[in-house]
Amino acid sequence: MSSDHRDQYYWRAKRDQFRSRAAYKLEFLIERYGIIKDGQAVLEIGSSPGGWTQVLVDHGCRVVAVDIQPMDEIPGVIFLKLNILREDAAERIREEMARSLVQRFDVVLSDAMAKTSGIRSSDHAASVMIGNAVMKIAMDTLRRGGVAVVKQFQGDMTGDFIKNWGHYFRDHRITKPPASRKESSEVYIIFYGFSGKETDNSVQG
């Protein structure tokens, strides 16, 4: 196997016993942007195979993990096999919150992504669709002041995506972790300081 940029993270994940190299993307987001604090309640969307989940557990977080694909059990983690594009996705998650005595999540994280086609415009559009579904769930499950993080293939709809959802939050950042493939348009959009659904949607001049 070649020793290119991607393989460095592959072998690091093996050494550190992470289920995927994506764990280092989340570690970067935590260290650089402070997106979670130890012990917080976190909704993780797109969790399988569990690399991010392992990092969250290492930080003592209470995790509800969601994915359309199955995921091997991680002690202390609640897993829901669920398609977030379903109309009742938010309701299913709220039901689990009630069972788990979680009133609201401190953080909503998403590493969810559709299978890529290799057609940049199509992959971008699919990532925006998933991102919108994630943010709709965040509107119903995130506490005021909370943080939402969404993965997206950056493209011509990214600006509108940030504009549409950004007015529910105090601030945002866009970043590409070092563990992301250099040739990929993958970015993570971080929204800070959720103000709640009932907010002033007027355009500020």
Curated annotation (Swiss-Prot):
- Which GO molecular function entries does the Swiss-Prot or TrEMBL record give? rRNA (uridine-2'-O-)-methyltransferase activity
EC no. given is: 2.1.1.166
Q: Which InterPro entries match?
A: RNA_methyltr_RlmE, RNA_MeTrfase_FtsJ_dom, rRNA-MeTfrase_E, SAM-dependent_MTases_sf
Q: Which reaction does it catalyse?
A: uridine(2552) in 23S rRNA + S-adenosyl-L-methionine = 2'-O-methyluridine(2552) in 23S rRNA + S-adenosyl-L-homocysteine + H(+)
A GO CC term attached to the entry = cytoplasm
Q: Which domain of life is it from?
A: Archaea
The positions flagged as active site in the entry are: 151 (proton acceptor)
Q: Which residues bind S-adenosyl-L-methionine?
A: 50, 52, 67, 83, 111
Sum up the protein's function in the record's words. Specifically methylates the uridine in position 2552 of 23S rRNA at the 2'-O position of the ribose in the fully assembled 50S ribosomal subunit.
Q: Which family, according to UniProt?
A: Belongs to the class I-like SAM-binding methyltransferase superfamily. RNA methyltransferase RlmE family.
Q: What is this protein called?
A: Ribosomal RNA large subunit methyltransferase E
Species the sequence originates in: Thermoplasma acidophilum (strain ATCC 25905 / DSM 1728 / JCM 9062 / NBRC 15155 / AMRC-C165)
